[in-house]
């Protein structure tokens, strides 16, 4: 069977999926991941029917970094029979101002993408590592980069620029938006399950390991809460939209070096910094610590605030969509956010919400509230197949 491999690499985990190809149709064959890299490494994979294919732990020294994790995943994948690899699709967080759609990767493109590492220091180096390795090991297999920023590149210029001298915009200092692969999938999925709403004004809340929100009009991104780097918006693993005066205070008054400020913002901020406990929403909801309650209240407030901002950018709202880990699986968070958006006409059906229904608003709600699982990997696979199937590929 002809197959595609989809790779999503992070600092402490490596996710991969194998899709079978029949014509232009894709069928998911395998889901896998290596997590706990450098601490408690574990390789797991399941078949499409849920059958466990491997569950193996490693010594921390054996899988101490991402390249080692890639090597172990590749070693296992090579034991599989019946697949003919046609291409590899990669999630790349930052495409900068130049990449507005997926692209076949060559050495020039790879060098160009490496130049965006300062724009996404936690993500870009990890995204590019498996690409480099794949190009070395399988130079004849096409590698495709799919960007989290690309879906937002159609924003009007006045929404993406900062009030700085124009030269900074020309250098790439602008609002980009992220989680674009997720939003693109939701836009397509919404056309299937709620076609009327999909043509209107939709606010999507991607509440996963990172969090952001996006305003869609007729399936196109109009505005996003994430800005220049993937550390802004209603996030919980970083401080979100931080007043630049705070950064100046840390440098000028506290005497912190730039790297120390970066470490603070990327590693010690967000809900973990505010609560002193965890970035995991499940831990915070289960805790009776008042700081945990404060962190949850802060997060919900930021989501409600951003929901109102996006509704204003869209000129109103017809539907609201929850997606990603917390958005799909946390009824308490969904309930509190919808309650905060009641002034926009959103009315929650508590029973549907607790049951995890696809539609959790009442029949009389002016805003339809949906819960839709996202599928960034399928979006990457679709883009990859389309690109390698193009006449000039």
Swiss-Prot record:
GO terms for biological process: acetate metabolic process; acetyl-CoA biosynthetic process. Pathway: Metabolic intermediate biosynthesis; acetyl-CoA biosynthesis; acetyl-CoA from acetate: step 1/2. Its cofactor is Mg(2+); Mn(2+). It comes from the Bacteria. Mg(2+) binds at residues 8, 376. The keyword Transferase applies. Signal peptide: none annotated. The keyword Oxidoreductase does not apply. It catalyses: acetate + ATP = acetyl phosphate + ADP. Its main location: cytoplasm. It is found in: Cytoplasm. The active site is at 148 (proton donor/acceptor). ATP binds at residues 15, 206-210, 280-282, 325-329. Its EC number is 2.7.2.1. Substrate binds at residue 91. HAMAP family: Acetate_kinase. Belongs to the acetokinase family. Homodimer. This is Acetate kinase. The gene is ackA.
């Amino acid at each position: 069977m002809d197959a595609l491999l989809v790779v999503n690499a992070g600092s402490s985990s490596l996710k991969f999926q194998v899709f079978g190809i029949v014509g232009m149709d894709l069928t998911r064959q395998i889901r896998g991941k290596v997590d706990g890299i450098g601490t408690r490494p574990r390789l797991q994979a399941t078949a499409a029917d849920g059958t466990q294919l491997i569950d193996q732990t490693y010594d921390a020294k054996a899988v101490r970094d991402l390249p080692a994790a890639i090597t172990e995943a590749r070693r296992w994948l090579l034991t599989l029979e019946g697949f003919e690899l046609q291409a590899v699709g990669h999630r790349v967080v930052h495409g900068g101002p130049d990449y507005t759609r997926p692209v076949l990767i060559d050495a020039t493109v790879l060098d160009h993408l490496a130049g965006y590492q300062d724009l996404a220091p936690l993500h870009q180096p990890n995204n590019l590592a498996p690409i480099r390795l794949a190009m070395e090991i399988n130079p004849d297999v096409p590698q495709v980069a799919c960007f989290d920023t690309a879906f937002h590149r159609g924003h009007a210029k006045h929404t993406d620029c900062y009030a700085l001298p124009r030269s900074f915009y020309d250098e790439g200092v602008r609002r980009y938006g992220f989680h674009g692969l997720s939003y693109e999938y939701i836009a397509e999925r919404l056309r299937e399950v709620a076609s009327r709403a999909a043509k209107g004004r939709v606010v999507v809340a991607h509440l996963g390991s990172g969090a952001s929100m996006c305003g869609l009009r007729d399936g196109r991104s109009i505005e996003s809460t994430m800005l220049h780097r993937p550390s802004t918006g209603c996030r919980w693993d970083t401080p979100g939209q931080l007043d630049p005066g705070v950064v100046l205070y840390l440098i000028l008054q506290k005497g912190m070096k730039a790297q120390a400020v970066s470490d603070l913002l990327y590693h010690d901020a967000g809900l973990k910094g505010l609560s002193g406990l965890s970035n995991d929403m499940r831990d915070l909801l289960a805790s009776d610590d008042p700081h945990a309650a404060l962190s949850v209240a802060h997060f919900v407030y930021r989501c409600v605030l951003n929901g109102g901002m996006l509704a204003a950018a869209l000129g109103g709202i017809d539907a609201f969509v929850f997606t990603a880990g917390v958005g799909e699986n946390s009824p308490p968070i969904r309930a509190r956010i919808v309650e905060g958006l009641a002034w926009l006409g959103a009315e929650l059906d508590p029973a549907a919400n607790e049951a995890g229904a696809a539609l959790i608003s009442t029949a009389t709600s002016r805003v339809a509230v949906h819960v839709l699982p996202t599928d960034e990997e399928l979006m990457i696979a679709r883009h990859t197949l389309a690109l390698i199937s193009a006449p000039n590929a």
